[in-house]
Amino acid sequence: MKEIRFHGRGGQGVVKSAQIIVQTVVESGLYGQFIPFFGVERKGSPVFGFLRIDNSDIRVKCQVYNPEVLMIFDDTLLKMPQTFAGLEENAIVIINTTKNIEELNLPDIKMKVYTVDATGIALETIEKDIPNTAMLGAFAKATEL
């Protein structure tokens, strides 16, 4: 089972991007599950999501505690301790940022880090700060799913 955790902010399309991944994997014959986690907060508040992909029925229904893939839609969330909590060794980490990897002050965990200026791409193409589509492209490339 592949487990993916999303960290973003309300309005960035975190939930929609996870729904698109689940729909895509289900249509390809796999099983997918997405559990969003957010409150009644307004746009800009932290949003989390937990996604699973497997070849068989997914019976577990809880948060993803040990992700193999981490999608971070806002680099200001890198400072939150729970962002990297439980990260599997050699996990894939995709970060929406304009900074290079050395500037991010990432924890000393063995991981494969990919950065993309998804916000810049979104602003250039749709003139809105909704980076989910560019993040989906980075996800597809980095994970080869």
Predicted ranges, named:
Residues 1-145:
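Active-site cofactor/cluster-binding pocket
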